[in-house]
Swiss-Prot record:
UniProt binding sites for NAD(+): 41-65
Signal peptide residue numbers: 1-18
PANTHER family, per database record: DEHYDROGENASE_REDUCTASE SDR FAMILY MEMBER 7C, PTHR44668
Main location: secreted
Gene coding for it: dhrs7c
Protein name, UniProt field: Dehydrogenase/reductase SDR family member 7C
Function: Putative oxidoreductase.
GO CC terms, sorted: extracellular region
Upper classification of the organism: Eukaryota, Metazoa, Chordata, Craniata, Vertebrata
Amino acid sequence: MGFLTFLIVPLLILGISGIVYIYREVVRLMSRSALKNKVVVITDAISGLGKECSRVFHSAGARLVLCGKTWEKLEALHDALISVADPSVTFTPKLVLLDISDINNMEAMGKEIQDCYGCVDVLINNASMKMKGPLQSVSLELDKKIMDANYFGPITLVKAILPHMISRRTGQIVLVNTIQGKIGVPFRAAYAASKHAIQGFFDCLRAEVEEFDVSVSTVSPTFIRSYHVQPQPGNWEASIWKFFFRKLSYGAHPVEVAEEVLSTVSRKKQEVFMANPIPRAAVYIRTFLPELFFAVVATGVKEKHFVEEEK
């Protein structure tokens, strides 16, 4: 009996693994087929995540409108996409020069985006401005700049695109946010505030447009790592406090997040957290045991000051 168990258990594990793999591949292929011919707008397409989103949606057969504030980088992305794509199953992306923080020009930009294909099926809000530092050292001017880039700009674009989705009774609006839209991290006050604001806006938006068959989704990783930058051992960025909010050792890779965005769009998921159990637990602890959460946060801040004083 023991020998049979020794043989059966590995085979059972292997069989289950095979079934899971096949299921994931089927879901992935269905996700891509569901996006063929869809008009997908990606803001800040020239960022690391923007490029990966452009790649996966382009290969899925979507009609892309790529937005960014540097024309040369948009053209380079355009050339990179068409150089590796099969022209018989993909569409040539259209480009729109867009600075998401330029609120006064957003209505005109929304019209230009609409005019690319006559409609928008999916709007992916990917643009974001990051900042860290003690809150008392951040000027009000910089606070406003961050709010323009992370909140006022994106919602102004949403308001420009939304009426057309409502009139067609179809569409999906996606926000690539961060877990800092749910919990605040010290020394990122302005950034966390902007992310809380945009999260609240999307939560309200979801309820208000459901009757018009417009879907609203948020994808929130702990943070998205760059391709090249990694924290140096021993510094504050690599400390136990960073571990508390990470997805992987150095955050979620743009490729991983882009695939999740693709899955979220095709399956119309409402909210996705890309996080390991520790930051997931932090969100719930903040809600149900706030005193404990605040104590842990304060301990992390004290640890930082202690390390700096020792240096």
